[in-house]
Swiss-Prot record:
Gene3D superfamilies: 3.90.79.20, Nucleoside Triphosphate Pyrophosphohydrolase. It comes from the Bacteria. Coiled coil: none annotated. InterPro entries: NAD-cap_RNA_hydrolase_NudC (IPR050241), NudC-like_C (IPR049734), NUDIX_hydrolase-like_dom_sf (IPR015797), NUDIX_hydrolase_CS (IPR020084), NUDIX_hydrolase_dom (IPR000086), RNA_Hydrolase_NudC (IPR022925), Znr_NADH_PPase (IPR015376). A divalent metal cation 1 binds at A158, E178, E219. GO terms for cellular component: cytosol. It comes from Yersinia pestis (strain Pestoides F). A divalent metal cation 3 binds at E174, E178, E219. It is an enzyme of class 3 (hydrolase). It catalyses: a 5'-end NAD(+)-phospho-ribonucleoside in mRNA + H2O = a 5'-end phospho-adenosine-phospho-ribonucleoside in mRNA + beta-nicotinamide D-ribonucleotide + 2 H(+); NAD(+) + H2O = beta-nicotinamide D-ribonucleotide + AMP + 2 H(+); NADH + H2O = reduced beta-nicotinamide D-ribonucleotide + AMP + 2 H(+). This is NAD-capped RNA hydrolase NudC. mRNA decapping enzyme that specifically removes the nicotinamide adenine dinucleotide (NAD) cap from a subset of mRNAs by hydrolyzing the diphosphate linkage to produce nicotinamide mononucleotide (NMN) and 5' monophosphate mRNA. The NAD-cap is present at the 5'-end of some mRNAs and stabilizes RNA against 5'-processing. Has preference for mRNAs with a 5'-end purine. Catalyzes the hydrolysis of a broad range of dinucleotide pyrophosphates.
Amino acid sequence: MELQLTGKESGWWIVSHENKLWLPKGELPQGNAANWSLQGTTARQIGEWQGQSVWLIRQMMPSGMGSVRQLLDVDRGLFQLAGRGVQLAEFYRSHRFCGYCGHEMHASRTEWASLCNHCRERYYPQIAPCVIVAIRRGDEILLAQHVRHRGGINTVLAGFVEVGETLEQAVSREVLEESNIHIKNLRYVTSQPWPFPHSLMMAFMADYDSGELCHDPKELLNAGWYRYDQLPLLPPPGTVARRLIEDTVVLCREHSDLSQ
């Protein structure tokens, strides 16, 4: 439920507009609303963090707007809450009017949804399921540089789940399309909400089965097998890609030790 702030409310403040996040001094604001001159604005509680309320305010600030990526190395829980806030703010901004009848909508008081009083249509935030997989071949891991990545970062393969696919089918298809190889021993590891803009990353590990590596130039700048102790520039800590790589490195090292 939304409320107008008096200035006495306290907690963490997620102020977001158009996928941007207010980060004065490079940090998420914390404390009383009055300390950040937020009194008089409309806010909605979207969770709790370390025993304090987390508030969402949907508006643009004159300065200090940044990316939720800046919170990646702060704390996973806080990053996820901030990501939720950014996604909700964008959802409500883009769902002011009903896509069926064109009438103005309002936010539900009981769930994350926008409601139309005219035709009774109900809209929920969009979530795009993605698969991401680390592939091992002996003491090597398959890493690639994606065309959309900057700074020379090499990472594992990933892609969106298509309509009618299982997660397992999506992994096998993406790997074959991007690298021309087949995999085996696919196993689920973990998941991570990824608000860029609204993905849910489902992480897997797999072993190489067959095929000659040949990367898809439309998706990848390059791809190669890297020995576990000779890795290129990797994704930052806090990302599910980095965890997959680190977990696979452990298996590569064990394989190398057994081979000696």
